[in-house]
Amino acid sequence: MIKISKVDERIYGSFIEHLGRAVYDGLYQPGNPLSDDDGFRKDVIDLVKELDVPIIRYPGGNFVSNFFWEDSVGPVEERPARLELAWRSLEENKIGLNEFAKWTDKVNSNMMMAVNLGTRGIADACNLLEYCNHPGGTKYSDLRIKHGVKDPHNIKVWCLGNEMDGPWQLGHKTMEEYGRLAEETAKAMKLIDPSIELVSCGSSALDMPTFPKWESTTLESTYDYVDY
């Protein structure tokens, strides 16, 4: 066999979404005899470790376009419940950003974070990045420390929204709208942490009416600022 080059391990990544029993009663089930002290199912942890998944995206999926990350951090008993519009359910925020970061450590994987560019935007993405990656001494990094997470998560890979070409997506954008929003969000985020890698949304499927023009149009705006 001739070796051409090394395959980027991130090709074999995956994602988890607050959908059905994927999170609640799936990977997270406090009180179950199979769960650890943090409420995570040990049998699920063992199976995911066996898969050797190098990177896992959070929090989805269509879910991200209605995700308010601030609701998912801090004392669990103080977190609000919200109507979850993507899958028409109730999100109680019993597990959130910091818990998922802990879970990815347990399964020997890396966390990829998606930002909400559907119903939110640039400021929210920057605040989230500051919370996750900045060491301390600022509003949101100090908030993370207050929440019991002293060291930054140092999340390397960030997704700029999810399936923004799809009319099913909350905050669906035209290719021109998304290209400009992704460009400005990327520029701002890299001012906070130049080391991050950014992923823009491509076409959701080959049969989308905007494929492949979506790619060429959005890249006219984002090419100099995104990595994937």
Regions found by a protein language model. Name each.
Residues 8-12, 52-54, 107-111, 151-158, ...:
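Short, well-ordered coil/turn segments that N-cap beta-strands
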Residues 22-30, 62-97, 102, 106, ...:
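Aromatic- and acidic-residue-enriched carbohydrate-binding clefts of CAZyme catalytic domains
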Residues 14, 52, 56, 104, ...:
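Conserved, mostly hydrophobic/aromatic
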Residues 53-76, 116-132, 205-207:
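Aromatic-lined carbohydrate-binding surfaces of glycoside hydrolases
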Residues 174-228:
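Noncatalytic carbohydrate-binding groove/subsite architecture in carbohydrate-active enzymes
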Residues 35-48, 96, 211-228:
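Short, acidic/polar
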Residues 1-54:
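Mature N-terminal, pre-catalytic/accessory segment of carbohydrate-active enzymes
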Residues 36-65, 96-103, 107:
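Catalytic domains of carbohydrate-active enzymes, especially glycoside hydrolases
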